[in-house]
């Protein structure tokens, strides 16, 4: 499974397939927090960052 993290409208989002999931992290927070969050929700997934 591939998970893409992306900044949109001031928040980090996870994109899984065609679903866009808003995270509780603002775009000013560290990317490492978002990656840890994604790994906890989707263990074993490949995580990519999109600009």
Label each region the model flagged.
Residues 25-46:
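A short, charged, amphipathic alpha-helix used as a generic interaction element across diverse proteins
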């Amino acid at each position: 499974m591939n998970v893409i993290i992306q900044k949109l409208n001031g928040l980090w989002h996870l994109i899984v397939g065609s679903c866009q999931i808003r995270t509780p992290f603002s775009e000013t927070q560290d990317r490492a927090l978002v990656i840890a969050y994604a790994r906890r929700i989707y263990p074993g997934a490949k995580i990519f960052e999109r600009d």
